[in-house]
Swiss-Prot record:
A Pfam family: MatK_N
Family classification: Belongs to the intron maturase 2 family. MatK subfamily.
Gene name in the database record: matK
Molecular function terms, GO-annotated: RNA binding
Function per UniProt: Usually encoded in the trnK tRNA gene intron. Probably assists in splicing its own and other chloroplast group II introns.
Cell location: Plastid, Chloroplast
PANTHER family: MATURASE K
UniProt key word Ubl conjugation: no
Protein known as: Maturase K
Organism (species): Agonis flexuosa
Annotated Gene Ontology cellular component terms: chloroplast
Keyword vocabulary terms for this entry: Chloroplast, mRNA processing, Plastid, RNA-binding, tRNA processing
Amino acid sequence: MEEFQGYLDLNRSRQHYLLYPLLFREYIYALAHDHGLNRXIGFENAGYDNKSSSIIVKRLITRMYQQNPLIFSAKDSIQNQFFGHNKNLYSQILSEGFAVIVEIPFSLRFLFSLERKXIPKSHNLRSIHSIFPFLEDKFTHLXYVSDVLIPYHIHFEILVQTLRYWVKDASSLHLLRLFLREYWNSLITPKKHITFFFKGNTRLFLFXYNSHICEYEYIFLFLRNQSSHLRSTSSGIFFERIYFYVKIXHFVKXFFDNNFQCILWFFKDPFMHYVXYQGKFFIASKDTPLLMNKWKCYLVNLWQYHFSVWFQPGRIDINQLCKYSFDFLGYRSSVRLNSSVVRSQMLENLFLINNAMKKFETIVPIIPLIGSLYKSNFCNTFGHPISKPTRIDSSDSDIIDRFLRICRNLSHYHSGSSKKKSLYRVKYILRLSCVKTLARKHKRTVRTFVKRLGSEFLEKFLTEEEVVLSLVXPRTYSTSRRLYRGQIWYLDITSINDLXNYE
């Protein structure tokens, strides 16, 4: 047990980074607003034209020197200068700069790890679609799966205490407490209406949430490696990280609480896979339900004792993989048994051999897609196409190009679907919504406008996939048609955007 405890000491840096003084450096805010560094996170205009203007930063810093807005009192808690009249602007600017600063210890540790292993940073990137071929190869041989929602902290102070292992600057931690205290409810309530602050400060809250996920996964992966004689060499993709894609090919060391030392020997699973995605994770194994129940008990104890998060064991279901479907990255995935009957004749005897083969299927769920189209005003709640009044002022070519771009992105991302019937319906909604928008702009009926456009307009939507396929396959009709009906995983997709982001 002492040997285990030696492995469990985290290799955290003991250096004391003085991060708080960087908050008063203008270049930090320029980095925060650099779209080249934040391509995946869009920035909403906060009411000023030049987002990187040093004048605004100087005024903010001067105001912070002249006043002490971070101190709350009963008298001015409502009309505080910091969270008062200019609450959105000032808090957004500060939190964006603070998000860049607090990531410094993590980024240094990440780059040092790559240099120590002589791994080029570019080789560590993985497409979102790269996980699906992995699932197709591995999940057909597994038997049980558990799909779990990762619980949130009940209090922000627990999250701050976790960060103390990495960030040694007390002033920075106090400022983080300030942001979390003010906006904690919007962070831990996903269904709640997203406030202006939350939309404009996604990077800070992603950092706070990912630090919790990182701490949990360090412990989880340590126990996984301890439970098996086989090293964890599979590629693990963490979609919610600030540095998104990580390879797990080394022995993970983690801090471990004394409450779990007695159950380390329980887990001897030689064939288990773990995938985390969008606030959830699932573990799949080839072993018996008894072992899966032991992992279930471990997870509940881990969250309750180490992270002080109450989690009911009944929320972790153990299902047979061949009878269970789970939603994963815009797909509904499952393992199905495909039966094939082979007729064999030997001399005068005739045999019928029934072969059952497992196949990993990925289907596009139509209801979530129609919900996204409805939120973006492409259709009503029943999926009937409607016009887009916000695009009437644009030119005809601009309107058509926007609809084609959305259609192309959807076709590109969902090209790996086993059945494309749902995708055809979505394309039909977009095509008819585009026609209705153009007809409304020119004050004509849909039928009249379709006759005016002719067949060339419809061909733009119908031939979009074949144009993409021609880049990766010979331009023959049979090959293009066969690939279009089959599954294609494009390995150049590194982010997922809602339909509204394509507007």
